[in-house]
Regions:
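Iron-sulfur (Fe-S) cluster-binding modules
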Residues: 1-129, 159-161, 270-417, 437
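Catalytic cores of enzyme domains
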Residues: 98-278, 391, 395-398, 402-460
Length: 460
């Protein structure tokens, strides 16, 4: 179901869900009987076709860079604590987190034994032998920082005073016989963990860029009890020994960031919610302009393989409408792209200075925060295929690729041939490229409208 109301007047920090309609309590419920948040692993039995093991290395990378050096100079930020919390919430909502809460951090919130992702150690060993092939500005600094983070032992965070807690809602469970869903069966918790860790890792780095100490905590690596923090931050209620949300039930994942930045805290949810909150028009119809009971999950009424948008209504043609003289299209080296040319000074010293060390990215704190994780992911862009080839028909492979990409949050996926002229002739190091693949998977992400760039047409 599409949106019926506009959200143009809804502040970004309030998020998609009408959480302001939920009743709050001045007192926190008893948390003694609350079960710990489950420790999550990304392993599957040998021979499984699940996508979850392929996600493990990315989760480990985020767990590896969840902490890092803090800027020695504290940036100028709002003195009003509520304004600070609103800014950080808006950042998380811009990254598509479902709900965000802020709470204080007490000694009871720490785990007696911190959880550590066992994949981080294996990843550290693998990275010591991998080489990057990119000329991305400042990649040398990113790699040095990454190796330092891998080698460093996490210190105590008892000086942290508050926590930002992130809730990631589950999508519909794929049907066992659903086309395109062979790879994503029983992967809801891992999907939520991956998406939550992404925002937590970036936001923790953002706080460190601003000069405040911060550390991310995920379902696989954490120093704090996520269940307790979720209740205190007003993201969940206590139901027996489990967590529950008035609208989502138990279908969500959690991540958090602890920090020493002073913030304004949210109140816990009341144990009993009024009917006006559970059956309000804001929740049922989305009158507030955001997510509603009927549209918060686009796949409630669509198969994953079809995507969230009605692509089936678009007209298709056999060949592109733009003419391409394929036999005469020249292949050019990677060195000719504008980022490489800027670094080598082809466009003058001023542009070269802006590209040095990735300054054009680092000059904005949010971009600098995102850049660290993006640079770390560069090392995971390639890898060795499994020795055993799994037989799968082209039609089924195409369906599974689309189904998996949409399940993980991509907005549009297309499959096509990948002709030789679409490849660079040489990589960033000058090594000739012999095209190894003849097929391409193209994916685009909706950039949204919250920034001027997205609102001015560069929205994908």
């Amino acid at each position: 179901m599409s949106k019926l109301f506009s959200d143009r007047n809804r502040p970004i920090h309030m998020g998609r869900f009408p959480t302001e309609r939920l009743m709050r309590s001045l007192l926190c419920p008893d948390l003694k009987a609350l079960a710990p948040w489950p420790m999550l692993g990304f392993q599957r039995p040998a021979g499984s076709r699940s996508i979850v093991p392929a996600m493990a290395e990315f989760q480990a990378m985020m767990d590896a860079v969840r902490d890092g050096p803090t800027n020695s100079v504290i940036s100028e930020i709002p003195a009003d604590l509520q304004e600070r919390s609103n800014h950080l919430k808006a950042f998380a909502y811009f990254n598509d987190i479902a709900m965000v809460g802020v709470t204080d951090l007490t000694v009871d919130d720490y785990l007696s034994s911190p959880r550590l992702n066992p994949e981080v150690g294996r990843l550290a060993h693998a990275l010591s032998t991998r080489q990057t092939k990119t000329l991305a500005a400042g990649i040398d600094m990113i790699m040095a920082d990454l190796k330092e983070s891998m080698a460093a032992k996490p210190g105590p965070i008892t000086h942290h005073t508050g926590a930002l807690v992130f809730l990631v809602d589950y999508r519909r469970d794929p049907r066992p016989d659903e086309p395109g869903c062979d790879w994503v069966q029983d992967a809801q918790a891992e999907r939520a963990a991956l998406l939550g860790a992404e925002t937590a890792t970036v936001l923790a780095n953002y706080l460190r860029v601003l000069g405040f100490n911060a550390r991310a905590h995920s379902a696989t690596t954490s120093d704090v009890e996520l269940s307790r923090l979720a209740v205190k931050a007003g993201l969940a209620q206590v139901e027996g020994d489990q967590l529950s949300h008035p609208w989502l039930g138990r279908r969500f994942g959690l991540a958090a960031v602890t920090t020493d930045m002073p913030l304004a805290y949210d109140q816990p949810l009341a144990s009993v919610q009024p009917k006006s909150a559970l059956k309000s028009l804001d929740w049922i119809l989305g009158r507030h302009g955001g997510a509603s009971r009927n549209n918060h999950d686009p796949y409630a009424v669509r198969d994953y393989v079809s995507g969230a948008h009605p692509f089936e209504t678009l007209k298709r043609v056999e060949y592109p409408t733009t003419y391409m003289d394929e036999p005469n299209i020249a292949r050019v080296p990677k060195r000719t792209d504008m980022f490489a040319r800027a670094q080598f000074g082809d466009m003058g010293p001023q542009v070269q200075k802006g590209a040095t060390g990735g300054h054009y990215v680092r000059k904005a704190a949010p971009s600098a925060a995102q850049r660290r994780l993006l640079g770390a992911f560069v090392l995971l862009q390639d890898g060795e295929p499994a020795q055993e080839l799994q037989r799968i028909s082209p039609e089924k492979a195409g369906e599974n690729i689309k189904g998996a990409s949409y399940f993980l949050g991509i907005d549009a996926t297309g499959l096509s041939r990948c002709p030789e002229w679409s490849w660079y002739s040489h990589d960033a190091r000058g090594t000739p490229i012999i095209p190894p693949h003849h097929h391409a998977i193209s994916m685009i992400v909706d950039q949204g409208f919250e920034t001027m760039e997205g609102a001015s047409g560069d929205d994908w």
